[in-house]
Amino acid sequence: GREIRAIGNPKAATSFELFADVFINPATVHSKWITTTGTLLIVPLFGAIELVQEDRDAFIHINQVSKLWVKAGTKLQFKNIYPDHSVRFLMLLIKSDTAEPQSTVEYKLDMLNDLQEVHTDRSCSLNLGQFEGREETVYTYQRKDTSVFAYVLQGAFEFQNRLLETGEGLCIWDQNPIELEAL
């Protein structure tokens, strides 16, 4: 998998700390030490995972976003319960000192060629989308003095006139609205 950590902070309002695209082989466990206190978002892309933490377990399926508050120094274990299939999920950590209750919400990507908000709270908004080739959209964020991080799961995109291919991410700021085009 890939992991991206925030290095420096171009905007004071940006609290993005960690992004990871994680693959787990069949019947194995992926361990992760959390180094920053904050809100962790877990988004399975295919398969389901069992999350084991010191004081709780959770089972997270595809088409769900699970949110939990974690402290620095916490060890998380992600189990692939499938004996013959790999699983893949996204993990995003947003810095925060405010404890929030664990929650899981369902979403469905039933629209093509547009971004769909699958999670929002006072610190961040998470949008996912499926696009056909040569389709365009515009993303406008509501809060000023913030930044936007984009990551391409599969294919190629132009993100504000910058080429991104599978597994590449980009953080930009001071640009609103933002133009996206699937290639």
Positions of predicted regions on the chain:
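Short acidic-glycine-tyrosine-enriched beta hairpin
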Residues: 53-72, 110-113, 158-179
